[in-house]
């Protein structure tokens, strides 16, 4: 399973709320506009182009997805909550 760190900067409240709800369907919110997403790259790319980017005004907003390596995730230093997200052993698609 691949992990992605997805973050956004969206100016409009309505667009921001809609994008956050979409991300929460597949990802774990770790900060206000930052999510950890346990998704294969193909699924992430599909969601980006079919769902998430459609909610943005790309002249004003931005969305970024950074790959997280398993080793870097295990070395993460976390203070406060939430804890490091560990997805279930299986995913129903």
From Swiss-Prot:
Its cofactor is Mg(2+). Keywords: Antiviral defense, Endonuclease, Hydrolase, Magnesium, Metal-binding, Nuclease, Plasmid. This is CRISPR-associated endoribonuclease Cas2 2. InterPro entries: CRISPR_associated_Cas2, Virulence_VapD/CRISPR_Cas2. Homodimer, forms a heterotetramer with a Cas1 homodimer. PANTHER family: CRISPR-ASSOCIATED ENDORIBONUCLEASE CAS2, CRISPR-ASSOCIATED ENDORIBONUCLEASE CAS2 3. SUPFAM superfamilies: TTP0101/SSO1404-like. GO terms for molecular function: metal ion binding; RNA endonuclease activity. Gene3D superfamilies: 3.30.70.240. It comes from Synechocystis sp. (strain ATCC 27184 / PCC 6803 / Kazusa). Belongs to the CRISPR-associated endoribonuclease Cas2 protein family. GO terms for biological process: defense response to virus; maintenance of CRISPR repeat elements. Its EC number is 3.1.-.-. CDD domains: Cas2_I_II_III. The keyword Hydrolase applies. Mg(2+) binds at residue 9. HAMAP family: Cas2. CRISPR (clustered regularly interspaced short palindromic repeat), is an adaptive immune system that provides protection against mobile genetic elements (viruses, transposable elements and conjugative plasmids). CRISPR clusters contain sequences complementary to antecedent mobile elements and target invading nucleic acids. CRISPR clusters are transcribed and processed into CRISPR RNA (crRNA). Functions as a ssRNA-specific endoribonuclease. Involved in the integration of spacer DNA into the CRISPR cassette.
């Amino acid at each position: 399973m691949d992990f992605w760190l997805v973050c956004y900067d969206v100016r409009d409240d309505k667009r921001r709320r809609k994008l956050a709800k979409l991300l929460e369907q597949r990802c774990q919110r770790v900060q206000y506009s930052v999510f950890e997403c346990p998704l294969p790259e193909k699924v992430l790319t599909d969601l980006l182009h079919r769902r998430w980017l459609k909610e943005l005004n790309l002249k004003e907003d931005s969305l970024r997805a950074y790959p997280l390596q398993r080793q870097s995730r295990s070395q993460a230093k976390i203070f406060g909550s939430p804890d490091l997200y560990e997805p279930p052993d299986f995913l129903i698609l």
